[in-house]
């Protein structure tokens, strides 16, 4: 039996040369839209990075839209995506649909200034870096030092992109910290709430 999460919608596109079937993500990529809709891990990061690099090569002057609906995930994978977003020439607009949590919040706020958005009912969430370790005491100590190093990196990124002082970032991310879209604007995580334009 086919699992619903493994079903990818197909879209038929007609042209003078005939019909062609695209999976929905390929069609979005043609429009310079990337969708991050899962937990962040190495495989997901590799796919997003490949798409960013492809769109950079295709047209370095045209914006890219990164839609985010993610609970976060592996810090190293998220930082690989973050560094690529900062490296490529096109401006990356970020849009939170649903939820951006943890590492996904870092990616959301790292979009191009003035082009970071959330939908009206989106939830943005920050917290401390998390990790686990087992084994000898010295191994656990090494793992703890590494998670603290990564946490410092994430906090510095949040300071850079939100304009908030480090003390506030440390205080607010010490435990689970939830924001609605308006609070995220006030915090500096996003620039604007996307609304449907009113009909005139």
Curated annotation (Swiss-Prot):
GO terms for cellular component: cytoplasm; endopeptidase Clp complex. SUPFAM superfamilies: ClpP/crotonase. It holds the Pfam family CLP_protease. Keywords: Cytoplasm, Hydrolase, Protease, Serine protease. The active site is at 102 (nucleophile), 127. One of its GO terms (molecular function) is ATP-dependent peptidase activity. It is found in: Cytoplasm. Cleaves peptides in various proteins in a process that requires ATP hydrolysis. Has a chymotrypsin-like activity. Plays a major role in the degradation of misfolded proteins. Fourteen ClpP subunits assemble into 2 heptameric rings which stack back to back to give a disk-like structure with a central cavity, resembling the structure of eukaryotic proteasomes. Belongs to the peptidase S14 family. This is ATP-dependent Clp protease proteolytic subunit. It comes from Dehalococcoides mccartyi (strain ATCC BAA-2266 / KCTC 15142 / 195). The lineage of its organism: Bacteria, Bacillati, Chloroflexota, Dehalococcoidia, Dehalococcoidales.
């Amino acid at each position: 039996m086919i699992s619903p999460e493994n079903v990818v919608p197909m879209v038929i596109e007609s042209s003078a040369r005939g019909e062609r079937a695209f999976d929905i993500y390929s069609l979005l990529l043609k429009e310079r839209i990337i969708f991050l809709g899962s937990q962040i891990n190495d495989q997901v990061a590799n796919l997003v990075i490949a798409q960013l690099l492809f769109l950079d090569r295709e047209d370095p002057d045209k914006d890219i839209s990164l839609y985010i609906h993610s609970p976060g995930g592996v810090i190293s994978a998220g930082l690989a995506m973050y560094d690529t977003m900062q490296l490529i020439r096109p401006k990356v607009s970020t849009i939170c649909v649903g939820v951006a949590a943890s590492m996904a919040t870092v990616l959301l706020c790292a979009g191009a200034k003035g082009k970071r958005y959330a939908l009206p009912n989106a939830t943005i969430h920050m917290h401390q870096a998390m990790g686990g370790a087992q084994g000898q005491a010295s191994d656990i100590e090494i793992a703890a030092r590494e998670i603290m190093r990564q946490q410092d990196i994430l906090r510095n990124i949040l300071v850079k992109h939100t304009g908030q002082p480090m003390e506030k970032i440390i205080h607010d991310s010490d435990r689970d910290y939830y924001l609605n879209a308006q609070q995220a604007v006030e915090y500096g995580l996003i620039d604007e709430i996307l609304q449907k334009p009113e009909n005139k």
